[in-house]
């Protein structure tokens, strides 16, 4: 699990290996993200940027609008949660990134997604 807070936006991520959807050389992980506005000003998530690393050092960058087809607007005290997935060629790796947030007044900032592990149980000591 990882947690980061940027300008009142808390991002928490938990990942899980999905053996039923994996096979040798293709390891599927789901991750659940909770984005909470702990600040005093509304903010909208408009885009995402993920950096995905596998155990071989291969790096993939994923950039796009919103998350799971949405651009959630969070009032103070509100949160948004979603689950997505990632496929690696190796049994472990990591993800990290940022969400581009925009305040109602137009101020934009990047909310940090702290690095979190993607690990098949029993593969690391």
Swiss-Prot record:
It comes from the Bacteria. InterPro entries: ApaG-like (IPR050718), ApaG_domain (IPR007474), ApaG_sf (IPR036767), Uncharacterised_ApaG (IPR023065). Residues 3-125 form the ApaG domain. NCBIfam families: PRK05461.1 (NF003967). PANTHER family: OS05G0170800 PROTEIN (PTHR47191:SF2). This is Protein ApaG. It comes from Anaeromyxobacter sp. (strain K).
């Amino acid at each position: 699990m990882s947690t980061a807070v940027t300008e009142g936006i808390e991002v928490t991520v938990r990942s899980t290996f999905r053996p039923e959807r994996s096979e040798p050389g293709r390891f599927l992980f789901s991750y659940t993200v909770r984005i909470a506005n702990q600040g005093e000003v509304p903010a909208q998530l408009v885009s995402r940027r993920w950096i995905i690393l596998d155990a071989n050092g291969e790096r993939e960058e994923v950039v796009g609008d919103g998350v799971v087809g949405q651009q959630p607007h969070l009032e103070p005290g509100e949160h948004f949660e979603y689950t997505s997935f990632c496929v690696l060629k190796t049994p472990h790796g990591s993800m990290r990134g940022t969400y581009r947030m925009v305040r109602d007044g137009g101020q934009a900032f990047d909310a940090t997604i702290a690095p979190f592990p993607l690990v098949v149980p029993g593969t690391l000591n």
